[in-house]
Amino acid sequence: EHAHARGVDVVVTDHHECHGKLPDAAAVVNPRRPDCPYPFKELAGVGVVFKLLCAFETKRAGIPEQDAVRRICADYADLVAIGTIADVMPIRDENRLIVAFGLRRIEHSQRVGLCALIDAVGKRPDGSRSPRAQRITSGFIGYTLAPRINAAGRISSAGLAVELFLTDSREKADA
């Protein structure tokens, strides 16, 4: 409401059931809207944003949707997989594809903060940036990584987790 009152277009993304009036926004992207024909209703919030990014990339680059999905997956499938698992969404249909691809991306991740977090819990004992010593599984994400990521928001600020995923500094990630 604050941004809208100042003339800023707002796009709301969500994945929860819609109850009552939708927010006053330029767009409300939610597969669970009663008027939404999208067939898969069980995307996590991060999955909704992923689909929105794919649509933007298709339009922005003027490329076929499958090419846009490949580009966005290459950059973000790891984070979308973590978010989908952490949100305890059912791992079927689109979520299954996103998580399967994302887990493989995590195994070869160059994200400094994600590598530091995985190293901190002992999944990659040699500390190298080579492929993981063990396969990364949804169980590992759900029971080991996700609680640590969520703890930042409960103990201090969720911004700490965001900073961890965005940093290029191993020293900062290890702190």
Predicted feature descriptions by range:
Residues 1-2, 21-26, 40-42, 61, ...:
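Short acidic, glycine/serine/threonine-rich loops at helix termini
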Residues 2, 48-52, 101:
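Alpha-helical scaffold elements adjacent to nucleotide-binding pockets in ATP/GTP-utilizing enzyme cores
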Residues 24-65, 73-85:
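Short alpha-helices
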Residues 9-13, 35-38, 52-55, 169-172:
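Glycine-rich loops and low-complexity Gly/Arg-rich segments
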